[in-house]
Amino acid sequence: MDKQWQTITGKQVGDSYFQVQHPSGLTILLYPKENSSTTYAILGTRYGSIDNRFQRSDEPAPEEVPEGIAHYLEHKLFESEDGDAFDRFSKTGASANAFTSFETTCYLFSCTDALYQSLEILLDFVQAPYFTEETVQKEQGIIGQEIKMYDDDPQWRVMFNYLKAMYHSHPIREDIAGTVESIAKITPDLLYRCYNTFYNLGNMVLALAGNFDTEKVLEVCDRMLKPAGSVTVNRVFLPEPNEIVEPYVEKGLSVVLPMFQFGFKEPDADKPRSERDVAAMEVLLETLASDASPLFRQLMDRDLINESSFSYEYFEGSGFATVMFSGESKDPHAVAEAILKEAERYRREGIPKEAFERSKRALYGEIVSALNSTASIANGLVNMHLKGRELFTYIDSMADLTLEDVTRQLEKVFQKERSVLSVVLPLQ
């Protein structure tokens, strides 16, 4: 079979990997690491919980399906007429898993030997859906229990209450697993419909990192991959205003200390963000709130946060983007106020150059050291590819960042009128 090969080399790190466009439509990313004892493989599709409204290129109108189908489909794909895929992996000694996020569904394994056999299993079961009325109904009970369990999970609730207070219509505000009501509407026909739309190999990517023979990997792919049709699929979102829904939301649950999530809604989030944009925001967050920052020390000195729970993240994807700070605090309002004040000080006085340089070096070092892990490499390749980005471009962007890049992100995103505080309080 004819394949298009491309060697991609990082300007900063000097490492290389191969990108192969397979005739079946699948993009294959191969990152050899000869000294590695484990190989990690991950097969991902650009299909997550936010994809409940979509438009196929071969159909005239968009379609809407019940929430929770992507997650449901991931659960069901492990089952086939021949049994469970986990049982098949256990025979090769591979450790397998799968996950559904807001934007992607991924199936993965790691192994120390029997790689090609394990790869066959992965490519086989993901391309062989098997849904019946009986198995679909059985799964509804299992996932229904999972949904109810998350309803009382404080970390889950503080996050989704935050997203609901921030987003008016974007499906990021809905639980990944759906609701008990939405999954009751799922049928075998709907599962096949979504499978055939999103598990088209042209919408998917396979990445391997570790010690392997590239030719043998491609032989397995040639044998196992079923050619995709030329259908493309686009996400369809309702218009999302730049304004938030409400600035404060709280809920009582069984916690000892109040938990909080505080952050800012990025405007015009439907516009694409480059590798450089993402790197700039990550460096800004590190400069503002890392354990080396004045803000962190002040919050610790005032006993407003604890080191083990405080964290921050740039959470962004198709049609959404937000900067989030979370943790436990006796006074979440005081934490939010301190973050706002420090962002305002940065805007007024400028971001300290030394702190910016230190943060950039720290993050760059973390990213480069992650290239020693086959899991980090393969996950990074897939995650970047499914977002329309490239791993080495991101690393090179991090190294090339300027203070101006970071200041632009500060001015654009850290605005009080677009901030939300979500709190989970102890039950009275």
Task: Give the ranges of each region predicted by the language model.
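Second-shell loop/turn segments in exported
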Residues: 59, 74-76, 106-110, 130, ...
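His/Glu-rich zincin catalytic helix
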Residues: 1-84, 192-298, 420-428
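A structural supersecondary motif
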Residues: 261-268, 287-329
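Acidic/histidine-enriched segments that form metal/cofactor-coordinating
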Residues: 81-194, 306, 338-341, 351-379
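Short, flexible turn/loop "capping" segments at secondary-structure junctions
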Residues: 98-101, 174-175, 196-202, 253-256, ...
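Extended amphipathic alpha-helical segments enriched in small hydrophobics
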Residues: 323-352
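Flexible, glycine/charged-enriched surface loops at secondary-structure junctions
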Residues: 232-238, 307, 311, 349-359
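C-terminal regions of mature proteins
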Residues: 2-9, 205-208, 346, 359-428
